[in-house]
């Protein structure tokens, strides 16, 4: 090799002399890289050793470099904090040309944070366990974060029953841009004086929260008066009227149970805060374990951190990637209309913006819009959001509404958003580029369309995949975690959604109101209370979507009339398959107008009310439901031309291999499982209804009447269950449990019994059909529960292992004349000292 070195140098020199243009061309095609660091300066050249300080400077430098760039451009962003006081905007001038790509990425192993918040420091004790700190801010504060935990606006705690409306507010059509119709609503709401303390300070910051079956609405107050034994909360107008002008009893109502927010007089619980705008002071009651002298406290100030905004159709923002970045602490102070504030909707992640027809279908949803988000995009193509973190938002996480093409939202960790984690599309996309004839006699015309003709396009070919989405919609509980309106060729795959207050995944829009049918009850499509808004003009924009291999655990934790996966409207060619849904109301819910959808090989594990819901109302039709694996045989399926075939009931979640494979493949794929924080504690279903102290240290346990038993009780004969002595028992002729035991270690089975059974009971206990013990119950421990331990001989356990544990079947069998097995109040496996 040493002898050949001069020849190599010579050849290299000759090539360089002969082909200088080739070397220059090769040099130009290498990716060009800029660097950003919190300790840099925007006066620097943006190199590794002299980085920029802001993303805006890097964007501008990239924009200048684009015309001469022959290859991809990289912007590497060092770890640290980047305060965002004004939204960072990328437009069509920031596109990568042709097949090139511009990537804004975190430096390897580092975590750059773009924050819309400011620190709140100098906390001092106030009184009654309340602390206070200065905050220079002119607007009210709806969110505060203490040691990464969301604090709660001071509130009434319990729901207060409204006592009816007060006064009259009159709207005349055309009096303002928001006044589309004439009408009258209440000008205020009455409450019993006995239900609330007297609120005297910063009245305009007080809010009413109104919960309906499937959503929540918020409206501001302008004045509080007292009349006899009633408080009169006078609404901020016109939004108070707009919130009442919502159909289907989904808006602000006058006699429902409500919660009052944001008054110092209501500050009385740990985790609550109140911001006094006049005094510019934040008040907070610490939660257990919080030290306000060392706590990290953040108040949000910026509503949107990143905006990607091309020119619709003609000049989209193209070929950008944002990777490994963190976005957090965004603000949202409700929608402002003519000085009034509120956020109200009929359903899911959109907002009513005008006093219009309560039947929003007649307006073609023109009075509704999407909401703000930490990241907003419009008119983009080939954009990728990958492995980013979004947290602690005042409203939504990501909103991409109009003209979204070939976008990938993959591998992101989005948590603790105020509203939806991801919203795609827009409710007004019923038709693209509406023509003047698309006007109902009682509705708004195209002059109220958000998207002028020639600028409107529904999302096409969008991938939402491998995102970890826990604990979202924290403020606006009616927002679905992933919300997709009208879309085509959209894939929602391998996402893990945990703890959704309403529906986890919402796909589609329009109900049956735009299917083109001129009547109500169609002979093949089924019933509906109303004809299509535009007979003979069906919407045809949506279809060929897929919702597959998602893991959805604990949806519908607060609201009702939704499910793990929920669909609306016509979307032929759409497939919902291989999803694992656990603990919800309805597993899959094909609601009004759902048409041309195949639901296949989904797993629905209890508790739930129904596996699948698709009734015969709302002209939903031509639906397939096939190959499901479920724990309880409870369905509501009566829509026309709907086929239910080859479904398997698996009581107690004893899954066959095919179902186990679906569960294993659902949620995050192996490449993306590292986006879950190492300290993340997934929800433990088994602990529901179980005394944590009793279960401490157990390798496995089963308690009657709880999820821990439902997944372990594999068979039973003559079984009975019910309450006794403050707990739930199970007894019967035979009970079989499949339990987990440690491998190669001593262990014992422990059963909890009542020590004062009225009749003598005698039964045998087997482990894998080998006799373990004989138990007799009578009155050995009067008036109390007791635990009986049964040491497990190692030879009784199977040789096959599952990691560090193995499974065995515990069978309780009553002896002749033994009465019954049990009552059994709990069963657990405990390790023994080795």
Predicted regions and their residues:
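Extracellular polysaccharide-degrading/modifying enzymes targeting complex plant/algal/animal polysaccharides
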Residues: 30-379, 384-389, 430-453, 677-682
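Short glycine/acidic-rich loop motifs that flank beta-strands on beta-rich extracellular proteins
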Residues: 86-87, 331-337, 372, 394-400, ...
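A short beta-strand element within beta-rich, extracytoplasmic domains
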Residues: 206-210, 741-757
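Right-handed parallel beta-helix
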Residues: 318-329, 361, 381-392, 404-419, ...
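Glycan-recognition and processing domains
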Residues: 673-742, 818-833
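Extended, low-complexity, turn-rich repeat/linker tracts enriched in Gly/Pro/Ser/Thr and Asp/Glu
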Residues: 753-762, 818-819
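Short, surface-exposed beta-strand/strand-loop-strand elements in extracellular ectodomains
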Residues: 759-771
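Extracellular carbohydrate recognition and processing domains
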Residues: 772-800
């Amino acid at each position: 090799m040493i002898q050949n070195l001069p020849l190599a140098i010579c050849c290299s020199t000759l090539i360089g002399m002969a082909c200088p243009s080739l070397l220059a061309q090769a040099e130009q095609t290498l990716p060009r890289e800029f660097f950003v660091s919190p300790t840099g300066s925007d006066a620097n050249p943006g190199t590794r050793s002299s980085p920029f300080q802001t993303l805006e400077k890097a964007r501008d430098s990239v924009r200048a470099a684009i015309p001469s760039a022959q290859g991809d451009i990289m912007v590497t962003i060092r770890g640290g904090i980047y305060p965002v006081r004004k939204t960072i905007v990328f437009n069509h001038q920031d596109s990568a040309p042709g097949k090139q790509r511009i990537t804004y990425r975190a430096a390897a192993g580092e975590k750059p944070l773009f924050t819309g918040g400011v620190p709140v420091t100098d906390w001092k004790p106030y009184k009654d366990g309340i602390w206070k700190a200065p905050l220079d801010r002119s607007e009210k504060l709806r969110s505060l974060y203490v040691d990464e935990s969301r604090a709660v606006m001071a509130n009434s705690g319990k729901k207060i029953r409204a006592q009816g409306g007060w006064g009259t507010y009159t709207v005349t059509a055309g009096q303002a841009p928001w006044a589309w119709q004439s009408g009258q609503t209440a000008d205020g709401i009455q409450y019993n004086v006995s239900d609330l303390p007297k609120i005297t300070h910063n009245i305009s910051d007080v809010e009413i929260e109104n919960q309906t079956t499937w959503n929540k609405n918020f409206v501001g107050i302008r004045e509080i008066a007292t009349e006899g034994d009633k408080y009169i909360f006078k609404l901020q107008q016109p939004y108070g009227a707009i919130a009442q002008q919502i159909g289907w009893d989904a808006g602000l109502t006058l006699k429902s149970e409500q919660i009052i927010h944001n008054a110092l007089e209501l500050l009385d619980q740990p985790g609550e805060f109140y911001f006094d705008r006049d005094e510019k002071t934040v008040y907070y009651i610490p939660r257990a374990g919080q030290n306000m002298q060392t706590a990290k406290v953040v108040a949000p100030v910026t509503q949107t951190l990143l905006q990607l905004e091309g020119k619709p159709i003609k000049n989209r923002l193209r070929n950008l990637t944002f990777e490994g970045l963190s976005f957090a602490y965004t603000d949202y102070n409700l929608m402002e209309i003519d000085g009034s504030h509120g956020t109200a909707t009929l359903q899911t992640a959109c907002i009513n913006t005008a006093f219009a027809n309560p039947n929003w279908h007649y307006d073609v949803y023109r009075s509704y819009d999407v909401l703000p988000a930490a990241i907003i995009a419009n008119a983009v193509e080939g954009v990728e959001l990958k492995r980013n973190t979004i947290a602690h938002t005042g409203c939504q996480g990501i909103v991409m509404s109009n003209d979204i093409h070939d976008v990938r939202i993959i591998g992101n960790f989005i948590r603790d958003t105020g509203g939806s984690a991801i919203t795609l599309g827009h409710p007004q996309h019923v038709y693209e580029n509406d023509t003047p004839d698309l006007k109902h006699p009682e509705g708004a015309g195209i002059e109220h369309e958000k998207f002028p003709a020639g600028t409107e396009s529904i999302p096409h070919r969008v991938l939402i995949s491998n995102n970890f989405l826990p604990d979202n919609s924290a403020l606006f509980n009616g927002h679905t975690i992933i919300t997709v309106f009208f879309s085509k060729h959209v894939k929602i795959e391998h996402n893990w959604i945990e703890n959704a207050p309403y529906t986890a995944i919402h796909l589609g829009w329009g109900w049956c109101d735009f299917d083109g049918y001129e009547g109500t009850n169609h002979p093949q499509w089924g019933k509906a209370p109303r004809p299509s808004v535009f007979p003979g003009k069906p919407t045809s924009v949506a279809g060929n979507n897929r919702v597959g291999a998602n893991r959805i655990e604990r949806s519908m934790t607060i609201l009702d009339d939704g499910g793990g996966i929920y669909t609306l409207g016509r979307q032929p060619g759409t497939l919902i398959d291989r999803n694992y849904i656990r603990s919800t109301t309805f597993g899959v819910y094909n609601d009004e107008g759902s048409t041309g959808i195949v639901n296949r090989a989904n797993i629905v594990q209890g508790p739930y009310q129904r596996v699948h819901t698709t009734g015969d109302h709302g002209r939903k039709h031509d639906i397939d439901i096939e190959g499901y694996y479920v724990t309880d045989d409870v369905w509501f399926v009566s829509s026309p031309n709907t086929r239910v075939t080859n479904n398997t009931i698996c009581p107690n979640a004893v899954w066959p291999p095919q179902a186990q494979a679906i569960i294993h493949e659902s949620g995050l794929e192996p490449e993306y499982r590292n986006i879950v924080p190492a300290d993340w504690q997934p929800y433990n279903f088994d602990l529901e209804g179980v005394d944590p102290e009793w279960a401490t240290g157990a390798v496995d346990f089963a308690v009657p009447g709880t999820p821990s038993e439902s997944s372990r009780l594999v068979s039973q004969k003559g079984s009975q269950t019910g309450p006794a002595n403050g707990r739930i028992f199970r007894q019967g002729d035979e009970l079989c449990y499949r339990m987990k035991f440690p491998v190669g270690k001593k262990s014992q089975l422990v059963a909890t019994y009542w020590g004062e059974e009225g009749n003598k009971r005698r039964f045998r206990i087997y482990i894998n059909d080998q006799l373990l013990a004989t138990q007799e119950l009578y009155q050995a421990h009067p008036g109390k529960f007791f635990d009986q331990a049964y040491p497990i001989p190692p030879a009784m356990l199977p040789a096959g292992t599952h990691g560090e544990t193995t499974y065995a079947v515990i069978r309780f069998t009553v002896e002749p004349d033994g009465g019954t097995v049990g009552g059994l109040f709990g069963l657990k496996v405990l390790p023994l000292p080795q």
